[in-house]
């Protein structure tokens, strides 16, 4: 399909099914209500077929173009992306490290002509996410490397159990691998006041009854409270990479990632990461 047919967010989003551009309509009220109900249940909402089927090949094409620019990392990490602390017991989840093989295309690869950037900067899109979350303070992430990114997962790669840095993450399934790549999560496992390390350890030990899984297909949009819900992606099977677009929003205006985590995820940091270090909305580990 000729990609020149796609110029803005309305060319990608199925606005008939999800009338983001009609906030005063009954249809809009329903999709907000439905999304809010899913989030209230377990902190996870999936909007099936959010992207028009005809537009998906263009998003895949764009992902194929930038995938070689992804920062690939092969290391061991814990759920908090923090350093080991030998003063803690060996069973503490902060001392439980797992192999991580992953790749992220930084946000500065997505200019205004790209589909992901067009969707992210579409004001009705931001307003809908804000309404679905019932957020009073809601801003686009100010991180120039991380506001709009693509996660590229190749054969054998995955993402071990972890918490997100920002409170609300919005992801778009663009392409699945031939197998694997299952999203698993333990909803609302911690709070801003309580890390609940034992509950985290139970998930890591595979003894927790809290873990759920969902199958996302290309075109599905997911709203997820990953700051408080432990989650992972199981290893991808087959030679076709898994592409997921990630749109990040926060409650603190001007917030960016920490220098340590930014370096881990994107292989580099910018002056803004050092300038704004410590600007956070809570006191959690990561």
Which residue stretches match the model-derived regions?
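Fe(II)/2-oxoglutarate
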Residues: 1-41, 269-286
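Hydrophobic residues positioned within well-ordered beta-strands of beta-sheet architectures
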Residues: 47, 168-170, 243-245
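Catalytic core of Fe(II)/2-oxoglutarate
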Residues: 182-188, 192-286
């Amino acid at each position: 399909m000729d990609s020149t047919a796609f110029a803005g967010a309305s060319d990608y989003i199925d606005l008939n099914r999800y009338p983001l551009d009609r906030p005063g309509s009954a249809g809009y009220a329903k999709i907000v209500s439905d999304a809010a109900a899913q989030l209230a249940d377990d902190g996870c909402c999936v909007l099936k077929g959010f992207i028009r089927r005809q537009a998906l090949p263009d998003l895949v094409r764009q992902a194929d173009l930038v995938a070689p620019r992804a920062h690939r990392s092969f290391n061991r990490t814990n759920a908090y992306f923090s350093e080991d602390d030998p003063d803690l017991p060996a069973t503490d989840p902060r001392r439980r490290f797992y192999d991580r093989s992953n790749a992220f295309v930084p946000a500065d690869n997505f200019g205004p002509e790209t589909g992901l950037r067009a969707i992210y900067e579409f004001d009705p899109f931001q307003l809908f996410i804000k309404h679905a979350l019932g957020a009073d303070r809601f801003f686009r992430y100010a991180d120039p490397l991380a506001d709009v990114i693509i996660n590229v997962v190749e054969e054998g790669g995955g993402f071990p159990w972890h918490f997100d840095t920002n409170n609300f993450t919005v992801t778009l399934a663009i392409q699945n691998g031939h197998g694997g790549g299952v999203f698993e999560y333990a909803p609302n496992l911690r709070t801003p006041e309580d890390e609940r390390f034992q509950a985290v350890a139970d998930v890591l030990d595979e003894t927790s009854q809290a873990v759920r899984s969902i199958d996302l297909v290309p075109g599905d949009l997911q709203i997820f409270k990953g700051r408080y819900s432990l989650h992972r992606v199981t290893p991808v099977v087959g030679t076709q990479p898994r592409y997921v677009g990630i749109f990040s929003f926060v409650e603190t205006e001007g917030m960016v990632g920490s220098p340590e985590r930014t370096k881990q995820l994107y292989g580099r940091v910018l002056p803004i990461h050092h300038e704004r270090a410590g600007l956070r909305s809570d006191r959690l580990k990561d």
